[in-house]
Design a protein with these regions (language model features):
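DUTPase catalytic domain/fold
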Residues: 1-132
Length: 132
């Protein structure tokens, strides 16, 4: 069962649900089951993020950076883990492999337009706001 470890935690830890240990060789990705499926109300989504300790200490990160669980998805939450280190990494049953944050999401209606309002920033991106 996903769990928050402190009263101030936003993320619920997601643990591996495995029948046997899974070895992730350097540079490779493995799909790790959680044994968890959720039913979110419409207008909510769950986001699957890295656990900082796995990435910083072991170089093991979610393969897709951030996973999105839509409100109409009813399957098991599976975490793709990529080993970016030079050492093999072993995931065991019960290891915390990711964290899940549930958030209310506005779903706007998109409108195709050829005209956009002018702003002081314009089309500047990739560090443009720090250049005076």
């Amino acid at each position: 069962m996903p769990a928050r470890k402190t009263a101030g935690s936003v993320g619920y830890d997601i643990a591996a649900c495995l029948s046997e240990d899974t070895v992730i060789p350097p540079g490779e990705t493995r799909m790790i089951g959680s044994g968890v499926a959720i039913a979110l109300d419409p207008g909510y989504a769950a986001f699957i993020y890295a656990r900082s300790g796995l990435g910083i200490k072991h170089g093991v990160v979610p393969a897709n950076c951030v996973g999105v669980v839509d409100s109409d998805y009813r399957g098991e939450i599976i975490v793709g883990l990529k080993n970016t280190s030079n050492e093999q990494f072993t995931v065991c049953d019960g290891d915390r492999v990711a964290q899940m944050v549930i958030a209310k999401c506005e779903i706007p209606e998109l409108v195709l337009s050829g005209d956009l309002d002018e702003t002081p920033r314009g089309g500047g991106g990739f560090g443009s706001t720090g250049n005076d």
